[in-house]
Amino acid sequence: MDIKFLHLDFGDGVYAISAPSTEQMYLVCGTKKAALIDTGMGIGSLKDYVRKLTDLPLIVINTHGHPDHAGGNGEFTDCPIYLSDKDLDIYAKMCTPEFRQNDVRFMIGDEVDQIKSEFVTGLPKTLNVNDGDVFDLGERTLTAITVPGHTAGCICLFDDQTHCLLGGDSLTNGDTWMFLDHSLPLITYLKSMVRLLGMNLPITRIFPGHLPTPVQPDMILRKIACAKAILNDPKIGLPVRTFAGSGLRAEVNGGSILYDPLKINE
């Protein structure tokens, strides 16, 4: 694995950062602060890379507690780190170096043994983030929107300056993983997407937690259509196996979900 970061500058102080293991983080800069959205799997120094892009004081906001989104938090002990308290259990269990190394082993095999020294250590304490919390970065704000489903503590963030939505894993171009043991019932995810749509936010584009990025705002509608189709007929999906377990995969109108047919309704 090549331990390096890359970025795309989308203008207006928004940077998409690709980690060595390909997950996506985002840096959003105001006039007084910068917000780092997610810290990735914690391989290599994301902090050093971010400091090449901005010298503003940082805050870190995790879209949820999975290891490929909060695994690098240990580098940022000198700034506030926000994560929903509803994801603290999975953060504590899944963001240890040992758990993350095991995840990466599924990707690159025994090569992970050669890069163990590159894994960030430490699980710093986090501050809770609630629905509607506003992060003032100076002449721009990010507003937290809770979207429980993929995990109990998933959030999106709406940027009032560019009208982009930072979607984490809730709104990716690929499969939304709803088959995990700690994922909530599919109907909960559907309710989150319907609520998000009903907010009538003037979303221009969505920046997801995995490539490709960005995706179009109609991905919300596509995920809603897919979830409704599954709820109507839980057997429509085809079996899929991943490194994290197995589920059924359904795709409707370009929106796809990987789900557990036994976790459909509340």
Where are these predicted regions, by residue range?
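Conserved beta-strand hairpin/beta-sheet module of binuclear metal-dependent hydrolase folds
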Residues: 3-52, 157-172
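Divalent metal-coordination and catalytic microenvironments
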Residues: 28, 38, 50, 64, ...
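Active-site neighborhood of phospho(di)ester-bond hydrolases with catalytic His/Asp-centered motifs
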Residues: 36-39, 58-68, 81-85, 146-149, ...
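Active-site HxH/HxHxD metal-binding segment of metal-dependent hydrolases
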Residues: 43-135, 173, 224-237
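Core dinuclear metal-dependent hydrolase active-site scaffold
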Residues: 131-159
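Surface-exposed cleft-lining segments at the edges of enzyme active sites
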Residues: 143, 172-182
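Active-site-adjacent loop/tail segments of enzyme domains
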Residues: 180-197
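Accessory terminal helices/loops
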Residues: 194-266
